[in-house]
Amino acid sequence: MRIPHQAMKTIIEVDGAMGEGGGQVLRSALSLSLLTGQPFRLTRIRAKRDQPGLRPQHLAAVQAAAKVCAARVRGDRIGSEAIAFEPGPVRPGDYFFDIGTAGATSLVLQTLLLPLALAAGRSRLALRGGTHVPASPCYHYLDWHWRLLLARLGVHFDLALTMAGFYPRGGGEVQATIPGGSKPRSLQLMEPGTLRQIRGLSAVANLPREIAERQRRQALRRLRALLPSSEPEIVVEELPAVGRGTVLLLLAELDAGQACCFGLGAPGKRAEWVADEAVDALAAYLRSDGTVDPWLADQLLLPLAMGEGPSVLRTSEVTPHLLTNAAVIRLFLPIEIDVDGPLGAPADIQVQPAARPPDGMTIQRRGHVS
């Protein structure tokens, strides 16, 4: 689905206090504005956070989105609780964005990826900041998991990690190569099937390799107790980085479903606890009948909303981010998104783009995948 930038110039009013009331509202609105060409006004930014308003990494997302479409923006400053964003056409090209210290590169990348992937032209992004930081998908989650599911939908790009950036030093760098011209397909994922494989990564940066080995041993011990018939494979790596940090990431591959969970190290946090964090999250997913983990369910909503037809999948858990993202998407697109389950429980998610788009809207049609 592509929407001409000349159409639908009515300003969309977005309440930043909706749903979980955090940065998700802002990032979703920015992506949708780039995709549809529709301007928006966002008020009460991050109203439910201890420090409301734009923080540095949120401002970086606004400025990055504005740069790729030459947008006119008002209110783009630290602490601002309201912005107005009027986009121009998305311009493929080479861009560099410095998020600052340990600001999450993944969140800015996810804001820009789909608009650039659907644009007619090649783009390259370089983002500097945090690559493995709390409250955001780490780089390896994006590369091992998110990227592959988007490719299954017909959205193609490549990622590379030049330097890891852990909290609080940051200083990492991620590069994305986006060929452009992607046309998202619909997706049917209702039955996860049987577990085929568990792969993992235990990595350290500027810390003894033995810490990564301890993380690996604990994860393998726990996984073999939980899943006696499984043969997990976890590799150990030392990542180049400015600061210090650790990560333990697990990817479960099922017949049709897929889930990725990870734990991050922190001062005073034992290596075994990092592994337990990832294993506990993966075990919770495997106890459900979900086809995707709760984080991916949230991240797939927008690509599915831009797809050519109805999609359905099952999440292992309904999260506030999922419901918030759905609410913002409904403001910009004539679409039905049904989440058939309560907060915190597994649920079916159905995404139905409009069968008859409004005047000026063009929908590109392709087949679905299952």
Q: What would you call each of these model-derived segments?
A:
Residues 134-137, 161-175, 235-244:
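Beta-rich nucleic-acid/ligand-interaction surfaces
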Residues 303-370:
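Internal helix-turn-beta structural module
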Residues 23-43, 53-54:
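N-terminal glycine-rich anion-binding loops that anchor highly charged ligand groups
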Residues 72-76, 122-123, 156-164, 223-242, ...:
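Flexible, glycine/charged-enriched surface loops at secondary-structure junctions
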Residues 135, 185, 191-294, 312:
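Conserved mixed alpha/beta catalytic, RNA-binding, or beta-rich assembly cores of soluble enzyme
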Residues 86, 90-92, 98-105, 118, ...:
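Phosphate/diphosphate-binding glycine-rich loops and adjacent basic-rich segments that engage nucleotide
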Residues 10-33, 368:
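N-terminal basic/disordered segments at the start of proteins
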Residues 59-160, 175:
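A generic, well-ordered mixed alpha/beta core segment in the N-terminal half of proteins
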